């Protein structure tokens, strides 16, 4: 579905701690709005370019701190998408702990879901969102999910995951991530298992789309 100039994209911010179920919530919203042009952008894509650092230096970075992200670049590109301009989105290489040389061409869509642990930390970024969602999940469940994900999808050892969790992930969650809950419009307990919250969010997004001229949804 093409997007007209007067139909500004709806931006949904989905945040919460690592392993909280952000991706599941985002994917379920995506599935419910399958009739619309919709895309998910992950904040991890905007980790800083660290190509000038050694591998040891890259591994020592605190990736759960706001300064680990190139937030200015994310704001610029999200602003472009909201203005119906295409972008060349960076690609992050988890195996090399830095940004890849590749980019992905991204066109503006009716709905943009921005997902990440610290997307509500910066006021400038919050101001670009129409709906801000915080996925609230118990710490024990989150660490179990993180272990499963990082071992299977990112090839990491159990020891390295636990070390990072205790050193940075857990303390940064309580220092930076959890406090952003106060900025959320909607708090979703139980993550992707909360179908009522998913349905309410999808209905609200459709309502915003109609108000912006998507009369085909009436």
Swiss-Prot record:
Cysteine pairs forming cystine bridges in this chain are none
Keywords per UniProt:
ATP-binding, Cytoplasm, Kinase, Nucleotide-binding, Transferase
Record's protein name: Uridine kinase
Annotated localization: Cytoplasm
Q: EC number(s) in its UniProt entry?
A: 2.7.1.48
This entry carries the following GO cellular component terms, namely: cytoplasm
Which Pfam families does the record cross-reference, listed alphabetically?
Answer: PRK
Annotated NCBIfam families: PRK05480.1, udk
Look up keyword Aminoacyl-tRNA synthetase and say if it applies. no
Q: In which pathway does it act?
A: Pyrimidine metabolism; CTP biosynthesis via salvage pathway; CTP from cytidine: step 1/3; Pyrimidine metabolism; UMP biosynthesis via salvage pathway; UMP from uridine: step 1/1
Keyword Nuclease tagged: no
GO biological process terms, semicolon-separated: CTP salvage; UMP salvage
Query: What gene name does this entry carry?
Result: udk
Entry's Gene Ontology molecular function annotations: ATP binding; cytidine kinase activity; uridine kinase activity
Which coarse location class describes where this protein primarily resides? cytoplasm
Write down the chemical reaction(s) this protein catalyses: uridine + ATP = UMP + ADP + H(+); cytidine + ATP = CMP + ADP + H(+)
Organism for this UniProt entry: Limosilactobacillus reuteri (strain DSM 20016)
UniProt: ATP binding residues: 16-23
Question: Into which family does the record put it?
Answer: Belongs to the uridine kinase family.
């Amino acid at each position: 579905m093409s997007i007209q100039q007067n139909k500004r994209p709806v931006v949904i911010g989905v945040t919460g701690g690592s392993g909280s179920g952000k991706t599941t919530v985002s994917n379920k919203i995506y599935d419910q709005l399958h009739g619309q042009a919709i895309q998910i952008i992950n904040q991890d894509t905007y980790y800083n370019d660290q190509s000038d650092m050694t591998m040891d230096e890259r591994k020592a970075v605190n990736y759960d701190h706001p300064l680990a992200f190139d937030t200015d670049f994310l704001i610029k590109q999200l602003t472009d998408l909201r203005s119906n301009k295409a972008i060349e989105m960076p690609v992050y290489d988890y195996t090399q702990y830095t940004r890849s040389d590749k980019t992905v061409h991204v066109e503006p869509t009716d709905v943009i879901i921005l997902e990440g642990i610290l997307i509500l930390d910066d006021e400038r970024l919050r101001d670009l969102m129409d709906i801000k969602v915080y996925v609230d999940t118990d710490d024990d469940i989150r660490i179990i999910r993180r272990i499963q994900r990082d071992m299977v999808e990112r090839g990491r050892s159990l020891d390295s995951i636990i070390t990072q969790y205790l050193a940075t992930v857990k303390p940064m969650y309580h220092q930076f991530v959890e406090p952003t809950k106060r900025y959320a419009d909607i708090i979703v307990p139980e993550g992707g298992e909360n179908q009522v919250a998913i349905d309410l969010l999808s209905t609200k997004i459709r309502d915003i789309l109609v108000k912006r001229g998507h009369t085909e949804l009436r």
